[in-house]
């Protein structure tokens, strides 16, 4: 019985030619008779001549074989990805705290297995996902800037490596609007600006000590903010290359900052320091508007909480437990000034191993004048909750795009995901996921920025959540003192 072939007649002919082509250079002079015999078996009588029907390609069999291997690897990768996605769908996404997470994309958190890992020669000090492209950037303590392409099969070789600074790179940030300029700051006292193709275009000098952190204005690509060990907060025009303003915000080393923009009142700067405090300042005037005091050690990082979900959850929690907050006027929670400002709550992380959540008193807003310190609580912020779970310094924070989850990285080598909504159920912000994968301190984390906004402007929270879900990029990275960057699945 004749065996059925899975190949077409043309494919069979191409395969036969490829076999002869592969064997020809391997055969010695005295083996040519054997090769002739094999050619007849394969119905290739003139294997040394070009065929009119079959296109002859050099090293055809080897190329086909390597293609099969690549496809097999790709299939395995896709099967693993499907398995991980199925696990996410089938899992209830619950922890020992009994908090059940939604299976919707809006509440996506990584399962805890690294999809890819990138290894550097030195300690990774900072990481950042590109706002638009599939690129991971990281800075190291030797001053090198690495750029990795997520879509590359080979994750051992960076897309690009730049000797950006002479000492450690402490922070990387991108502009919020196209074109996406990049800024890096360093312990060499400088800030460097890079274009979209990562060409160096300008160096900003002015700080007298380590530049700890930087961030662009959300509404103006030309404006960059920086904080330093020299205690100064500086405002830069990156195109002119000049410092527009400098003011002292703290009595000791300024560690980190976060920026929020208001349509009518410009930018507001939230900073933290070795003096164990955080401070809200008005960028244009440099005026201090509110203080955050309550940590027992260096405050490493600060973040504004977005209004999406967080405001509603925290307002409800305070209202239901107002007896715990006797100095917070209930009418303050409904103060419309917050709508003008673009901020209400913030979080801080410290070397005292805790994360604290704060209600910021609103500054006084007057027409044609810069904002003034708040009339409430002597301009002191109210601590709403304390997040305990890390066993060592909490070094980095980021906020999930949905505004509900807080993500923290610590010197205890763990990354934790905290659910604000658990406040309403248990009275505390509980951990819903702990990721363990690094062998060293977690120095930085980053959740991918949302895709570019559409022209529509959602108004209700439900519509806002749908818009965020549509624009979400489910990518999360971490950088560690173990010299690695991990992209989490």
From Swiss-Prot:
Q: Which GO terms describe its biological process?
A: cell division; establishment of mitotic spindle orientation; microtubule sliding
Indicate where this protein resides in the cell.
Answer: Cytoplasm, Cytoskeleton; Cytoplasm, Cytoskeleton, Spindle pole
**Species this chain originates from:** Candida dubliniensis (strain CD36 / ATCC MYA-646 / CBS 7987 / NCPF 3949 / NRRL Y-17841) (Yeast)
| GO cellular component terms, A-Z | cytoplasm; microtubule; microtubule associated complex; spindle pole
Q: Which SUPFAM superfamilies match?
A: Lissencephaly-1 protein (Lis-1, PAF-AH alpha) N-terminal domain, WD40 repeat-like
The protein's name in its UniProt record: Nuclear distribution protein PAC1
Assembly, per entry: Self-associates. Interacts with NDL1 and dynein.
Q: Fetch the InterPro entries from UniProt.
A: Dynein_regulator_LIS1 (IPR017252), G-protein_beta_WD-40_rep (IPR020472), LIS1_N (IPR037190), WD40/YVTN_repeat-like_dom_sf (IPR015943), WD40_repeat_CS (IPR019775), WD40_repeat_dom_sf (IPR036322), WD40_rpt (IPR001680), WD_LIS1/nudF_dynein_reg (IPR050349)
- Keywords per UniProt: Cell cycle, Cell division, Coiled coil, Cytoplasm, Cytoskeleton, Microtubule, Mitosis, Repeat, Transport, WD repeat
Q: Which residues form a coiled coil?
A: 66-98
Q: What does this protein do?
A: Positively regulates the activity of the minus-end directed microtubule motor protein dynein. Plays a central role in positioning the mitotic spindle at the bud neck during cell division. Targets cytoplasmic dynein to microtubule plus ends, thereby promoting dynein-mediated microtubule sliding along the bud cortex and consequently the movement of the mitotic spindle to the bud neck.
* Recorded family membership: Belongs to the WD repeat LIS1/nudF family.
So which domain of life are we looking at? Eukaryota
Q: Name one GO molecular function term.
A: dynein complex binding
Ranges of the WD repeats in the UniProt entry: 119-158, 164-205, 206-246, 249-291, 328-368, 389-428, 437-486
Principal place of residence: cytoplasm
